[in-house]
Amino acid sequence: LGDVYKRQTLTGLDNIYMQQVKAYGNVDRDPGERVISVTYYALINVTDYANSLLPESDLEWISLDRKRELIFDHEQMLDDAILLLRRHAALHPIGFNLLPEKFTLTQLQSLYESIYGETMDKRNFRKKILGMDILERLDEKDKKSSKRGAYYYVFNRQRYESMLDKGFVFTM
């Protein structure tokens, strides 16, 4: 509980989706003393927490492509967390936790491209995600990006859970 309080105090993160990754306890992982660490990943929208880090904490949000060299086995911890996140994203619709309630297919594709660190073919992505029948297209369009506009969609969690009961498997 102390760690939860410390995390909430330092980062402002509270009531979020967190997944345990792994425990690390090799004898030689820290030259100073024996240390056991448990890692987690959390799904958050950083813009919601941009100002929540305590200034005196020396913490900052950074993009993975701007990360600095990490100490001890922390690089392995990060790699393990990214791998587990990608596995979960491939098998569960966890990405919808990071999107606004209504979103465009471009926003959804951009999210999955960020998770996987690679560009996806637009036509194939749309065919696959729409073929799952877990999205509902709204009559409303986002006209910020183009004159024609892009339809907004919502994730139909109830339909998804009903389909799970019938053996549906979410695969990206």
Regions inferred by a protein language model and the residue ranges of each:
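Short, small-residue-biased leader/transition segments that mark boundaries at the very start
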Residues: L1-Y5
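Active-site segment of metal-dependent pyrophosphate-handling enzymes
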Residues: T9-S52, R66, R86-G95, M132-E136
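A generic structural signal for well-ordered coil/turn residues at beta-strand boundaries
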Residues: I36, P55-D58, G149
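C-terminal catalytic core of Y-nucleophile DNA break-rejoin enzymes
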Residues: S37, L70-F72, E118
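NUDIX/MutT-family hydrolases
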Residues: Y41-A42, A50-A89, L98-T106, N124-D133, ...
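Core RNA-modification/binding signature centered on pseudouridine synthases
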Residues: L91-M172
